[in-house]
From Swiss-Prot:
Record keywords, A-Z: Chaperone, Cytoplasm, Stress response
Biased composition (Polar residues): 1-16, 209-224
Lineage of the organism: Bacteria, Bacillati, Cyanobacteriota, Cyanophyceae, Synechococcales
Disulfide bonds: none
Pfam families: GrpE
GO molecular function: adenyl-nucleotide exchange factor activity; protein homodimerization activity; protein-folding chaperone binding; unfolded protein binding
Name of the protein described by the UniProt record: Protein GrpE
Any GO BP: protein folding
PROSITE patterns, sorted: GRPE
Entry annotated with the keyword Methyltransferase: no
Length: 224
């Protein structure tokens, strides 16, 4: 009997040690709620620093925009120059083809002019034939005029190697030195472009005899 009593006492002591003690709380005492602390940033953002950062970003974007715009303007200018150059080259090529074709026609005009100067048709039939090919010559000249082809007026003009081809040079009493005194073959131009140089005879000025004769004709100092 005494053994059972001691065992019961030990069990009660163990149970009492396992259960934590609960403090006495009065019914009227309020219990403080548990408040969780919110973590805060160690450093707050400074408005001035943020404004400076935005200004730097804006300046960077402006520089990028200016660089892209400058590149675009260069490309646009290069393309415009390329387009103009292509148009100019095409126009030059077209003008060269037209001038080349017109130059091939000029010998035909020369033949018509030689025939008109050398032939003296006699008889009604010959005159009718003469009028017929002269009509063709007039049509050909009119076509050349419509294409802007014009004859050069060279006699009495100063010799210009860009317009004239000097075939002969001789002394001439009527023209000074380096003046065209005779046209041997007509020259033609079109819109400032030479189709064919004029073959000319250029004056070398009065000869030495003419100069001495002119000097002898002047009154001497003793003559009066």
């Amino acid at each position: 009997m005494s053994g059972d009593a001691s065992t019961s006492a030990q069990d009660q002591n163990v149970e009492s040690n396992d259960v934590p003690a609960i403090p006495d709380v009065d019914a009227g005492t309020p219990i403080d709620p548990v408040v969780e602390e919110t973590p805060t940033l160690d450093t707050e953002i400074d408005p001035a620093n943020r404004l400076q950062q935005l200004e730097q970003e804006l300046n960077s974007l402006k520089q990028e925009h200016e660089a892209v715009q400058s590149q675009y303007m260069r490309i646009a200018a290069d393309f415009d120059n390329f387009r103009k150059r292509q148009a100019r080259d095409q126009d030059d090529l077209r003008q060269q083809l037209v001038c080349s074709t017109l130059t091939e026609i000029l010998p035909v005009v020369d033949n018509f002019e030689r025939a008109r100067q050398q032939l003296n048709p006699e008889g009604e039939e010959a005159q009718a034939l003469h009028r017929s090919y002269q009509g063709l010559y007039k049509q050909l000249v009119d076509v050349l005029k419509q294409q802007g082809v014009a004859r050069m007026e060279v006699v009495g003009q100063e010799f210009d190697p860009t317009l004239h081809e000097a075939v002969l040079r001789e002394e001439n009493q009527e023209h000074a030195e380096d003046i065209v005194c005779e046209e041997l073959q007509r020259g033609y131009h079109r819109d400032g472009r030479v189709l064919r140089h004029a073959m000319v005879k250029v004056s070398m000025g009065p000869g030495p005899e003419s100069s001495s004769d002119a000097a002898s004709e002047q009154p001497q100092e003793g003559d009066a």
